[in-house]
Amino acid sequence: MEINSSGEEAVVKVRKPYTITKQRERWTEAEHNRFLEALKLYGRAWQRIEEHVGTKTAVQIRSHAQKFFTKLEKEAINNGTSPGQAHDIDIPPPRPKRKPNSPYPRKSCLSSETSTREVQNDKATISNMTNNSTAQMAGDAALEKLQRKEISEKGSCSEVLNLFREVPSASFSSVNKSSSNHGASRGLEPTKTEVKDVVILERDSISNGAGKDAKDINDQEMERLNGIHISSKPDHSHENCLDTSSQQFKPKSNSVETTYVDWSAAKASHYQMDRNGVTGFQATGTEGSHPDQTSDQMGGASGTMNQCIHPTLPVDPKFDGNAAAQPFPHNYAAFAPMMQCHCNQDAYRSFANMSSTFSSMLVSTLLSNPAIHAAARLAASYWPTVDGNTPDPNQENLSESAQGSHAGSPPNMASIVTATVAAASAWWATQGLLPLFPPPIAFPFVPAPSAPFSTADVQRAQEKDIDCPMDNAQKELQETRKQDNFEAMKVIVSSETDESGKGEVSLHTELKISPADKADTKPAAGAETSDVFGNKKKQDRSSCGSNTPSSSDIEADNAPENQEKANDKAKQASCSNSSAGDNNHRRFRSSASTSDSWKEVSEEGRLAFDALFSRERLPQSFSPPQVEGSKEISKEEEDEVTTVTVDLNKNAAIIDQELDTADEPRASFPNELSNLKLKSRRTGFKPYKRCSVEAKENRVPASDEVGTKRIRLESEAST
């Protein structure tokens, strides 16, 4: 061992040098012959070979054997014979490098034959399995490829709404004017079947795109929640579309038949639900093409030639020829479920047959919160029941069809859950959680308030709004569009103290706001969402640390009050259509993926959250200059209860004339709701301890008449 200068031994051990003391002993012919005999007798048993040779050690014999075997292999390669054939010996297999499971596999011939047979059989079975699996995978891939191909073929854009995993999604697409003449009627039926003939589906649907085939295609797709079976039966004739749709769809008790309008290869093949079922509207395309009508109890819809996906929905069939893009005249503000949803029998069933877990969660939330429960009951009273009358779009008196759906018994829990889902979807749509496609001209619908609010006083709204005749409906809608829809929804601020804690609630809803929660009540306007009644005292949308509404908030039923979060200063300052379109584009970017949308914080929510902790004014606290006077009034009367009368039927063009006469009172809540004192409780979760602790210390006690929907921070109220 080497020693360092410090006297310590070296850490690295160096190998000892060695010298070859004796010369390499050559193998004589006799030793080699004995070696060959021992190989035939003992194979690789080196000790026995050593005993047999007698003059060589085991190490020398192994070295000699290695050289000899390599020499034999070279000779065999050169001569083309098997190794060892010249000496009639079988070269024993080499020593294994690692310890195998079976160390000397001497039965190589038998094992090789059986293994090859097993491999062939396995290959056959594996090939069958892979053929089946690849057929299924190819079927799924063919569906996806077909959908993507249809999206990208004509350059049309599609934003897909996915509330739940693999449930039918509503598609809002722009349609090119060069789409071919093709209408398809499709329905959804909950049967659990396997994927079948998907390649045939792709081939036939592509040929259907040319408008030549009228084949019946069964593309059956396993859906995870409740197995939705899609039977698409397209027909390329426009005139018989309603007839064929009513023939193809047979009414079933538990069927989920959602209308599906297919423009060949120009639209994404997703599910499109039309929302004109409750009031019996007729949808007319902006190019004056065939109206998109709903069939009674069939859920069929006729996809028409060159039809715009954002149709104007006039009040009367006389207005079908109108080609101007008008705001959506919604009769009952309680339903803005999605952008285009059939509120008829089939859409009701599709809502009711969603996930049982989601429904039970909604039921528990409704039962634990009386205010939301009361509002949902009112909304459900106007929602079509399962066995009730379904409005007929061909009726001349559309008010009868509008009243027919809610002229029955009090709503059950299923209808309440369904109406709550619709209201929540409407609120999500207006708030930007759900992607909406920006319209090419203006907003094609009024994102109307989604439910009545908790109130304690009954007052009539303006008589001119109630008694608007049917003849002036179109004129009024065009006027509102010319004035940039500033007059679409009027908010009349009257400071009246709350004298009675009970009362009936009319559709012209008055919502009472206490000083503790003076938030922006901003109804969504017709073509713009820029009309804002702004108050100084704001409630932060994310004051609890989360952008999602807690279960105690009446936000699913309070869309105009929740709309202000999505509006920043620039949007409210500008009243042009481009600003509204840009805002919708921003909503799409902020909520592009909706699979985990309840976990995401949108762009506006992040701005509001930053402004809260920097103690600045929140985005919803900015208001147009024409409302500054009302802000000062509301600040002076801080100790009083402010009554805001929201006219929900300004643009609804008053479908039910019988309810809207000047002599008769408005339709009101059910009797059991009129005596119910609506009070909301805080049952939501508290994600951040800091916010909740601070809010507990600074919370203002509220009276019985006023529900504290949000926690207000005093330092924020002073801004």
UniProtKB/Swiss-Prot annotation:
Please note every region of biased composition (Low complexity).
Answer: 171-185
Which residues fall in a compositionally biased region of kind Basic and acidic residues? Answer: 499-521, 562-571, 706-719
Q: In which tissues is it expressed?
A: Expressed in leaves, shoots, inflorescences, embryos, endosperm and seeds.
Up-regulation conditions: Circadian regulation under long day (LD) conditions. Expression peaks at dawn, gradually declines until dusk, and increased at night.
| Subcellular location(s) per record | Nucleus
Would the keyword DNA-binding turn up in this protein's UniProt record? yes
Q: Name one GO cellular component term.
A: nucleus
Residue ranges for the region (Disordered) are: 77-135, 171-190, 386-411, 494-601, 620-640, 696-719
Add the further remark from the entry.
Answer: Plants overexpressing CCA1 have a reduced number of tillers. Plants silencing CCA1 have an increased number of tillers.
Q: How does it assemble?
A: Forms homodimers.
The protein's name: Protein CCA1
Protein species of origin: Oryza sativa subsp. japonica (Rice)
Write the gene name: CCA1
